Amino acid sequence: MREENKGMPSGGGSDEGLASAAARGLVEKVRQLLEAGADPNGVNRFGRRAIQVMMMGSARVAELLLLHGAEPNCADPATLTRPVHDAAREGFLDTLVVLHRAGARLDVRDAWGRLPVDLAEERGHRDVAGYLRTATGD
């Protein structure tokens, strides 16, 4: 193990870089790292996966991560929020659709009992809330 990776959750190097690139919405860097073998489910030094820290406004980053095997339903252990909660709260319909088509569940509650649709409605994202209601049959 390289010295700089000691004490880090599994991943370290390229997984840390992947999470960083995803958080910045750097599509080409994300693609390069994934093609070079970065683990799409590896965690950064904060214990977060790239799909959890990705720039929610970049549906293309989400697509790349998911195409390479990122888990769309990974939850934050403290808050139980999933990427769909984040996309709904911030109003990123394109990213939400990508996550949903990749198998993300829309019927899961966070630690406060809120569904993604609740977060979209709280923030006034009518298009997102409408999609979520239609997709869940409400």
UniProtKB/Swiss-Prot annotation:
Functional description taken from the UniProt entry: Interacts strongly with CDK4 and CDK6. Potent inhibitor. Potential effector of TGF-beta induced cell cycle arrest.
Q: Which SUPFAM superfamilies match?
A: Ankyrin repeat
| Protein name stated in the entry | Cyclin-dependent kinase 4 inhibitor B
Q: Gene name on record?
A: CDKN2B
Q: Which parts are the ANK repeats?
A: 13-39, 46-74, 79-108, 112-138
Report the subcellular localization: Cytoplasm
GO cellular component terms, A-Z: cytoplasm; cytosol; nucleus
- Pfam families in the record, alphabetically? Ank_2
Looking up PANTHER family in the UniProt record yields: ANK_REP_REGION DOMAIN-CONTAINING PROTEIN, CYCLIN-DEPENDENT KINASE 4 INHIBITOR B
